[in-house]
Amino acid sequence: MYRILIVDDERIERNGIRFLLKKLNMEFDIDEAVNGLDALEKIHQADYDILLTDVKMPFMDGIELIDNVVNEKKKMRCVIFSGCNEFDYAKRAIRLGVVDYILKPVDPKEFKETLEKVVDELEAAKASDELKSKSMEFLYEHALYMLVNGEDIESIPVSYTHLRAHE
């Protein structure tokens, strides 16, 4: 189950996004925030897989929010949904690595395609992490076997040290 944070200062917009998420027939744990500052607090307190945010909100806009969390929460996927079609916002969003910038009113088909893409990315990242974990486990066991059998630690394959560095 993926955790989603919906951020918009307008309740009707949050409700609309929640409705579209439920129509996807996927399991999501959905939380909401009323502005960027509220969202930032929630993000620091919990792990979210997907951030769906508006741009123009009081206290902290969606671009600032993403800018504040993008380096800290590298695995979280960000999608903007906004009535703001100014090129500068879209350009900044792209630089921050958002998955998509959906204009309001949100087209259900576009929303579905975007969320499917996000879920596919999350699944691929999870599979990659699991593969790395299994590779590390194998290499640890191999290194232990070599040490127990009196082999020199320096003879352990370079791939072991390479994987260890990327843990």
What are these regions (language model features)?
Residues 4, 46-52:
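Active-site beta3 strand of CheY-like receiver
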Residues 32-41, 62-65:
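Helix N-cap/capping motif at the beta->alpha junctions
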Residues 57:
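Receiver (REC) domain active-site loop signature in two-component systems and cognate sites
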Residues 11-31, 45:
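Two-component/phosphorelay signaling modules centered on CheY-like receiver
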